[in-house]
Amino acid sequence: MASGSGPGAAASANLNAVRETMDVLLEISRILNTGLDMETLSICVRLCEQGINPEALSSVIKELRKGTEALKAAENTS
């Protein structure tokens, strides 16, 4: 087989495409000031790929952030 062909090359090209896609999504996320890091964004993408409704996922993330902020505020006033 010539170099750059075969299953290994295809897997490598696919991995590079996935990385590039995630980099673009992370940049969009930063532009939109979502506060999501690469790991969290990756989890969200996988959940959406599994059929989770993106709007519902967004609502859950917002509610979790509100809860976290409320807990932090309560700790600061104690």
Curated annotation (Swiss-Prot):
Its main location: cytoplasm. It comes from Mus musculus. The modification N-acetylalanine is found at A2. GO terms for cellular component: centrosome; cytoplasm; gamma-tubulin ring complex; spindle. Associates with the gamma-tubulin ring complex (gTuRC) consisting of TUBGCP2, TUBGCP3, TUBGCP4, TUBGCP5 and TUBGCP6 and gamma-tubulin TUBG1 or TUBG2; within the complex, interacts with TUBGCP3 and TUBGCP6 to form a luminal bridge with actin that stabilizes the initial structure during complex assembly. Interacts with TUBG1. Required for the recruitment and the assembly of the gamma-tubulin ring complex (gTuRC) at the centrosome. The gTuRC regulates the minus-end nucleation of alpha-beta tubulin heterodimers that grow into microtubule protafilaments, a critical step in centrosome duplication and spindle formation. The gene is Mzt1. PANTHER family: MITOTIC-SPINDLE ORGANIZING PROTEIN 1. This is Mitotic-spindle organizing protein 1. The keyword Acetylation applies.
